Each structure stands twice: as structure tokens, then as C-alpha cells.
């Protein structure tokens, strides 16, 4: 009985590590962000930013207004870079190409990356903190 309990304790951290979000989850978060924007679900898109949207640098109203002239948008998210770690925090960069069509028909193409952030499991009481969230964006227009 004691052996089974000891083995369960040893296996528990391994199981927790297996459930941690990985690089593909970060890429999926960027794709989910643009899917939400495309369907006009700006509340969900805003919520994918770190700190409940605050990391976007905008209020929700300003964030939503920023897409007022956008008819369509899509993202091509490439393979994320290496995960960086520090003090129970994780960061990862996802390279992207973003394509937008404005309501006036003008097309835009941006290239750059999103940096995503998460907290390792067990550090925050809020389980949502362990999922990837957008932390910053570096996008430049492609001519």
C-alpha cells in the first residue's frame, strides 16, 4: 500500500508536466485570436491577451474600434521558437504573416511575431494563467 502511494506521488508531477501547454498550443492561441476577430467576437479576442486584455495596450472599446474598418483577416502562424523560462513564467514567440481586407477593398499584409506568456501550473490560483496569452506583438507592413 505504501509503495503504491509513493509511486502515485512520484508520478503526479510527471502527469502535471505532460499537461502543460506546449509550443503548438501557443500557435493555436494565435490562430484562435484571428479566428475570433474574423467572426467579430472581439470579447474573446481581447481576452486572449495577457492580464484580461490589458497587455494589448488598449481598453476593450478601443480594441474593438481598431477593427471597425476590417472586413476580413487571417493569419499564417509558423512554428514557434524556443520557449524561454524564468521565475515560474514561460514566454514563446510565434512568427506570423497577417492578411487583412478592409471594408473599402484595400488589402494589407503584415509580417512579424507575437510573444505569448503563461505561468507554470501550481503558481497561480487562477488556472487560466497557465494557458498561453498574447503578451506583445511586433508587426510591420509588407509592401
Residue ranges of predicted features:
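Exposed beta-sheet edge and beta->alpha loop/turn motif
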Residues: 85-143
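Compositionally biased, proline/threonine/alanine/serine-rich low-complexity intrinsically disordered stretches
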Residues: 18-24, 65, 87, 140-143
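Cleavable N-terminal signal peptides
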Residues: 5-6, 16
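Short solvent-exposed beta->alpha transition segments
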Residues: 42-91
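N-terminal signal peptide c-region/cleavage motif recognized by signal peptidases
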Residues: 11-15
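Short, low-complexity N-terminal intrinsically disordered segments enriched in polar/charged residues
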Residues: 17-39, 47
Amino acid at each position: 500500500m505504501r509503495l503504491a502511494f509513493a509511486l502515485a506521488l512520484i508520478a503526479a508531477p510527471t502527469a502535471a508536466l505532460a499537461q502543460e501547454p506546449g509550443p503548438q498550443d501557443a500557435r493555436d492561441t494565435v490562430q484562435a485570436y484571428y479566428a475570433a476577430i474574423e467572426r467579430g467576437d472581439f470579447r474573446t479576442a481581447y481576452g486572449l491577451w495577457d492580464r484580461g486584455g490589458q497587455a494589448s495596450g488598449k481598453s476593450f472599446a478601443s480594441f474593438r474600434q481598431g477593427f471597425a474598418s476590417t472586413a476580413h483577416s487571417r493569419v499564417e502562424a509558423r512554428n514557434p521558437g524556443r520557449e524561454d523560462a524564468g521565475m515560474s513564467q514561460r514566454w514563446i514567440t510565434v512568427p506570423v504573416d497577417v492578411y487583412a481586407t478592409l471594408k473599402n477593398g484595400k488589402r494589407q499584409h503584415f509580417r512579424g511575431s507575437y510573444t505569448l506568456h503563461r505561468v507554470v501550473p501550481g503558481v497561480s490560483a487562477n488556472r487560466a494563467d497557465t494557458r498561453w496569452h498574447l503578451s506583445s506583438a511586433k508587426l510591420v507592413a509588407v509592401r
